[in-house]
């Protein structure tokens, strides 16, 4: 007689569990960009009030970067948590396929003068996006003041969008200036930025002081 035995098979499944972390600036890392560089997707970066003289790039990460406004909705924190580019480059850059899981909230963005970019890839470089430069990206920007930025010989002093559809909620775009187009906003090449409860005022440009749209909506 032949005996058959069933030998149980045990399968072990190993799961990688990702835990989100909160990084505090300047307590943990003394610069916002340094915190972004150290972060992983789903992390939150909380920034104390102060003036941060730097330019930041989200580098495609799905993270939240916020002032302490995130904790208590105290609007006074927006005006005293400042990212200041010191008239060197764009204050904030999104150009690595960021989406709505990339969130910037509760800052004043000021004194950017645009970058030196060629989004058309035709060898012509211009200064775009003093406050925010957005190329091939769809981030979410909430409760920010975008002010006193420039972008001469290009445009989009406050915000520049190229093939991008960022969403802006509760933002103020004011006092931005360019001798080209789009003092507050310059959106082009299939861009569809959206604005909810936002205000544009005292923005200046040769054409389109508030906004200038080209092949965009």
PLM regions and their residue ranges:
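Right-handed parallel beta-helix/beta-spiral solenoid domain characteristic of secreted/periplasmic
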Residues: 27, 62-119
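Extracellular beta-strand/beta-solenoid scaffold signature
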Residues: 80-95, 118-133, 152-161, 177-188, ...
């Amino acid at each position: 007689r032949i005996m058959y035995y069933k030998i149980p098979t045990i399968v072990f499944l190993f799961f990688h569990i990702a835990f989100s972390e909160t990084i505090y600036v300047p307590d943990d890392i003394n610069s916002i960009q340094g915190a972004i560089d150290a972060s992983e997707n789903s992390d939150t970066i909380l920034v104390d009030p102060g003036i941060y003289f730097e330019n930041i790039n989200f580098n495609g990460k799905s993270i939240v970067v916020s002032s302490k406004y995130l904790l208590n909705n105290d609007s006074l924190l927006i005006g005293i948590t400042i990212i200041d580019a010191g008239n060197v480059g764009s204050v904030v850059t999104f150009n690595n396929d960021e989406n709505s899981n990339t969130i910037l909230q509760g800052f004043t963005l000021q004194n950017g003068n645009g970058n030196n970019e060629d989004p058309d890839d035709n060898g012509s470089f211009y200064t775009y996006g003093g406050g925010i430069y957005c190329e091939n990206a769809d981030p979410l920007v909430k409760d920010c003041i975008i002010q006193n930025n420039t972008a001469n010989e290009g445009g989009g002093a406050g915000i520049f969008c190229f093939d991008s559809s960022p969403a802006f909620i509760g933002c103020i775009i004011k006092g931005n200036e360019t001798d080209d187009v789009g003092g507050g906003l310059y959106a082009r090449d299939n861009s569809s930025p959206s604005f909810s409860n936002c205000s544009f005022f005292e923005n200046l440009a040769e054409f389109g002081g508030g906004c200038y749209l080209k092949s965009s909506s």
